[in-house]
Amino acid sequence: MSNYVVDNKRRLAELREVRKQQEPHAYTTILMQDLREDFKSIEEPILDRESGITVKESNDKELVVLLSDWHIGYQFKDSKTGGYNFEILKERIQHFVNKTVKEILERDIRNVTIYFVGDLIEHVSMRNVNQAFDTEFTLSEQITKGTRLLIDVIQQISDVTDGNLTFGMIGGNHDRLQGNKNEKIYNDNVAYIVLDTLINLQELELFNGIEIIDNRDDVYTIEDQVCVKNIIVNHGDTLKGNVNHIPKFIKDQVFDILITGHVHHLKVKQEDYTRQHITVGSTIGYNTYSKELNLSRTAPSQQLLFLEPNSDDIELKTVYL
């Protein structure tokens, strides 16, 4: 075989290797050149910027104030978190109310709904070991202090609400009057006592300007509607597992939002379609119970929910205490 043939084949092989290495870069160069030419031809925006934009004359959003798990009467000491007692609770609630009032005024909110989502009190005899050891007050004192604190919160929010103010509450597992859950009487709950007191005050014209949701026939659940959204409120102590819980409450209507408490930390879960399950925080936060079970060191919090008619969007604001 002649040297010419060998040299020619070698050159061809080298050229093939060079082309093989350069080919991907050539495609990239062609792509970038084409993109530059395409961008030069864009004269108008792709999006129709005027579509769907309307200027509202006034704010039609409504506010839902979410309160839960105050556990009035419970106390513990902790050098890192500051512990918890009734005085600390009052400071945290006042901080939350101040934030709520500010949001109402700045956003020009007219209509407000307040839900208390259970466990107003701590109780004194829910455990075989003496629960009263960790409490500041008797059961009756816990109930009266809880009622007065709720009235104070409602009145402060009422003072800055120009439209409708609605209040509703449900009972939690700590609110049952019987300590042993296996011996409880259905509806025999602190929430009934508080609701009945507030309604009686209204009848005596001592607590006016507030619409109270009267669910005394079943204090464990509220079914309500805000901004054309069906809302169900339940403490959540009977809801187990990380599954969709809204279908469990559907009977003759579908609910858009499920609001629960009980677990003492904020959690938001999207269920089917645009349905939301919102778990409200607690004013306690991390405590000795959390420490024993190696649970998360959650900060105390309560939530504000902003809803808008004719929109599936929700805005949830967490106020850390």
Identify what each model region corresponds to.
Residues 1-107, 299-302, 306-310, 315-321:
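Basic, amphipathic N-terminal segments that precede the first structured/catalytic domain
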Residues 50-70, 82-201:
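Core catalytic region of metal-dependent phosphoesterases/phosphodiesterases
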Residues 55-64, 223-232, 272-275:
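Beta-strand-turn-beta hairpins that frame and shape the catalytic cleft
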Residues 74-76, 125, 242, 287-288:
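Short helix/loop capping segments that flank catalytic or ligand/cofactor-binding pockets
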Residues 78, 181-185, 290-292:
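Short, solvent-exposed loop/turn segments at secondary-structure boundaries
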Residues 155-163, 225, 249-252, 269-272:
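Short, surface-exposed basic-aromatic patches at helix termini and helix-loop junctions that form
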Residues 165-168, 209, 218:
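Domain-scale recognition of functional cores that engage charged ligands
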Residues 188-192, 200-206, 213-218, 230-321:
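Conserved beta-sheet core of the metallophosphoesterase superfamily
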